[in-house]
Amino acid sequence: MKIALPVFQKFNRLISSCKMSGVFPYNPPVNRQMRELDRSFFITKIPMCAVKFPEPKNISVFSKNFKNCILRVPRIPHVVKLNSSKPKDELTSVQNKKLKTADGNNTPVTKGVLLHESIHSVEDAYGKLPEDALAFLKENSAEIVPHEYVLDYDFWKAEEILRAVLPEQFLEEVPTGFTITGHIAHLNLRTEFKPFDSLIGQVILDKNNKIECVVDKVSSIATQFRTFPMKVIAGKSDSLVVEQKESNCTFKFDFSKVYWNSRLHTEHERLVKQYFQPGQVVCDVFAGVGPFAVPAGKKDVIVLANDLNPESYKYLKENIALNKVAKTVKSFNMDGADFIRQSPQLLQQWIQDEEGGKITIPLPLKKRHRSQQHNDQQPPQPRTKELIIPSHISHYVMNLPDSAISFLGNFRGIFAAHTKGATDTIQMPWVHVHCFEKYPPGDQVTEDELHARVHARIIAALKVTADDLPLNAVSLHLVRKVAPTKPMYCASFQLPANV
């Protein structure tokens, strides 16, 4: 026991040192004066030791039986190739990981097992490895050799690189968050990070293969069309026209000229799935490039889609054609207030334009069995289905959260005008109006209080009372929190008949 005790203690010390801590042991070199990205600065050579076995099968045996003796660091494989036709200086972390059986000259590649990161030399290995591990190596004629492992810029994550180059006072909140729209990454850098925008943008561009361009929002949304001034901080700037996939649809648009928010995809999907039914008529008052209208049209919902922004209207038409929903979606370029007031008339005009008030929609051809293809002389006949356009509108979508509630007054009287005052004979439409309900930081506001505030704004805009539209008749869905004290809601309710 007196002989075994030091060995046991030594083995325990190694096990203890091998346990993975939450801190990654290999951080990139630091240069807080860097303003233009220098990738070569991050090449780091780490002295290690590897075990080389004459019999390759012993690699797995040693790795399994002596787990606490081998390198166990995330993102670094413990099995590496030990010989290469390239000089060590040219090795990169990517090449370290390519474990092929032969190099470019068909020379067999010898693989080895990297020892624990605390072992930096052959002398370290003989001093730190437990005796049973050393005995196994000796029995199998293994050789402990020095090995230089090379890490480079590609090895580290974006946050790790940025933490190595940004000033220390910014390390608590390294700006790595962004939204992706098509091939564009969109950042909203705070003022203190603006001097480092090109550095931040280039790192994000490098670390995300699908991104070709990184933009930063220069100021808050202030234009009439909810677009914002932006700066290209990395990547190509010749075209900001993107293609974005959402709800099994493809949307094409110029990201700098229209409003698009990728974070709203679940809200687009929610309304289309939960409320809009095939054959119903939906008016999308602030349609943008069609994230509500186009998926609804694919579902055989009949949509009147409107947007005031000429660029949005241009791409709305293009997306209608691109997604083959021209039969069920009509586009308009009007002010939202005018569109609401004229919507019953626009629907009646559509009905008149279609023969018999019906829309004929082509269906995909039925796939024929191979035997039918040989036997039938006639090609498959085109198939169609018909949708009767209803004479009433079932839903209005108003996704303009800054000001949509202020447009509600335009509903007053429009149905009476088209039904000769007999509004009790028609089914009043549902309105889905998006809004913000901001409150001061520090205020303790309950969800019920916020709901009551939104309800009060709605009935005030409609010029009705709480008896006409009770709070419990309004469904309030929290879409997202734009900021901790700025929730965005979608209020859904059926218009009161006395509107």
Curated annotation (Swiss-Prot):
Q: Which residues form a coiled coil?
A: none
Compartments it resides in = Mitochondrion matrix; Nucleus; Cytoplasm
* The keyword Nucleus appears for this protein: yes
Residue span of the annotated presequence: 1-44
Please tell me whether the keyword Chaperone is annotated for this protein.
Answer: no
Q: What family does the entry list?
A: Belongs to the class I-like SAM-binding methyltransferase superfamily. TRM5/TYW2 family.
Q: What biological function has been recorded for the protein in this entry?
A: Specifically methylates the N1 position of guanosine-37 in various cytoplasmic and mitochondrial tRNAs. Methylation is not dependent on the nature of the nucleoside 5' of the target nucleoside. This is the first step in the biosynthesis of wybutosine (yW), a modified base adjacent to the anticodon of tRNAs and required for accurate decoding. Postspliced cytoplasmic tRNAs are imported into the nucleus, where this first step seems to take place, after which they are reexported to the cytoplasm, where the yW sythesis is completed by cytoplasmic enzymes.
User: What name is this protein filed under?
Assistant: tRNA (guanine(37)-N(1))-methyltransferase
